[in-house]
Swiss-Prot record:
Annotated Gene Ontology cellular component terms: chloroplast thylakoid membrane; proton-transporting ATP synthase complex
One matching Pfam family: ATP-synt_B
Originating species: Cyanidium caldarium
Single Gene Ontology MF annotation: proton-transporting ATP synthase activity, rotational mechanism
Name the UniProt record assigns to this protein: ATP synthase subunit b', chloroplastic
Note: In plastids the F-type ATPase is also known as CF(1)CF(0).
Subunit and partners: F-type ATPases have 2 components, F(1) - the catalytic core - and F(0) - the membrane proton channel. F(1) has five subunits: alpha(3), beta(3), gamma(1), delta(1), epsilon(1). F(0) has four main subunits: a(1), b(1), b'(1) and c(10-14). The alpha and beta chains form an alternating ring which encloses part of the gamma chain. F(1) is attached to F(0) by a central stalk formed by the gamma and epsilon chains, while a peripheral stalk is formed by the delta, b and b' chains.
Keywords, ordered alphabetically: ATP synthesis, ATP-binding, CF(0), Chloroplast, Hydrogen ion transport, Ion transport, Membrane, Nucleotide-binding, Plastid, Thylakoid, Transmembrane, Transmembrane helix, Transport
UniProt topology in membrane: Single-pass membrane protein
Record gene name: atpF2
Role this protein plays: F(1)F(0) ATP synthase produces ATP from ADP in the presence of a proton or sodium gradient. F-type ATPases consist of two structural domains, F(1) containing the extramembraneous catalytic core and F(0) containing the membrane proton channel, linked together by a central stalk and a peripheral stalk. During catalysis, ATP synthesis in the catalytic domain of F(1) is coupled via a rotary mechanism of the central stalk subunits to proton translocation.
Length: 157
């Protein structure tokens, strides 16, 4: 039987490239079957993992974008509040500075007025005492001159 098969195979002409026998469709079906098995067992799970990962990345990116926008809005609000607070603080400082300067000027004016008044009273008092002293001195001078005159006129007494 082996001889017959060998004779049959050796007597048959090969068709070369265009020799189609049952092996070509069998190999093609095996290839397709392997591709189907690989697709089901490896590629679909890997594709699912890749899609899940892509969705996760997109969600995370979207969440990060929203957080970034909220952060920018919050930062802008805080900057406005800080700027407003700085303006209010500066206005308060200016107001207090103006009030303090006004108070200092008023105190200075009051002090100058009281000093002038004190000096004026002191000068008036000094003039009054001067006049009084001059009167007393004049009276004493008159008395003394009267005594001298009397002694000169009446040397015996």
């Amino acid at each position: 039987m082996q001889d017959i098969l060998n004779i049959y195979l050796s007597s048959e002409e090969s068709g070369g490239l265009f020799d189609f026998d049952a092996t070509l469709p069998l190999m093609a079906s095996q290839f397709l079957l392997i591709m189907l098995i690989l697709d089901i067992t490896f590629y679909k799970p890997i594709n699912k993992v890749l899609k899940d990962r892509e969705n996760y990345i997109l969600k995370t990116l979207e969440s990060a974008t929203q957080i970034s926008e909220k952060t920018k809005e919050t930062l802008a609000r805080y900057e406005e509040v800080i700027l407003k607070s700085k303006k209010e603080s500066q206005q308060l400082i200016d107001s207090i500075k103006t009030k303090t300067e006004h108070d200092i000027v008023n105190e200075l004016i009051q002090t100058q007025n009281s000093t002038r008044e004190f000096i004026s009273k002191s000068i008036k008092e000094l003039y009054r005492k001067k006049e009084q002293t001059l009167k007393v001195l004049e009276e004493d001078t008159e008395n003394l001159s009267d005594k001298i005159y009397l002694k000169l006129i009446n040397p015996k007494q």
